[in-house]
Amino acid sequence: MDIDKDEIIRLCEEYGGEWGINHTRRILHLITLIAGGKQYDIEAVWLAAHLHDWGGYPKWAKPGVDHAVRSAEVAEGFLSERGCPKATIDLILECIRSHHTGDPARSLEAILLSDADGLDFLGTVGVLRDFSKAPLDLRGGYNAAKKRREVIPKLLCLEESKDLAAARLMEMDELLTAFERGTFGYF
């Protein structure tokens, strides 16, 4: 297997900011917090965390194709070209395809990625990520944050993730309430 991690990091950095390498770094940090002493394939999770959103990057995105589906397509080609073993590719693709579905019938690696990705959309960081997607549309950012606040906690699988989410949800509620108050509802 000839995987150049520096190349992967560079490609994530090329996309940039909160949707590229910084999001990936937060996910990997969250995985260390929620994994506890659980045994999992660290290498596969590292690769999946870096590749899971590539299908949403302008370089690889396809209009009308879900970013997780497209990310799996891109990752499969990328990993195959570099001699990654089929079993490892299959595990990484499972992680990527299911990283935002909440499907409980998955490997621990897929659950770790899904939970960490969800947690990164909660709390202050999550709200700011939603608002950054629509800087000229406050209502759009607000509605996206409110929807994630309702949906994501139901998708979390691990107790460690649910514990982390509790504090992030309180933070999110405080921020959204302050936003409502500060805008007088005019947004």
Where do the PLM segments sit?
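Short alpha-helical hairpin
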Residues: 1-10, 48
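Divalent metal-dependent phosphate-bond-processing catalytic cores, especially two-metal-ion Mg2+/Mn2+ enzymes
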Residues: 2, 13-40, 51, 101-187
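Short amphipathic alpha-helical interaction patches enriched in hydrophobic/aromatic residues
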Residues: 12-16, 35, 54-62, 79, ...
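Short glycine-/small-residue-rich flexible loop motifs, especially phosphate/cofactor-binding loops
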Residues: 32, 76, 93
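Short, flexible active-site-proximal loops enriched in glycine and acidic residues
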Residues: 40-41, 83-91
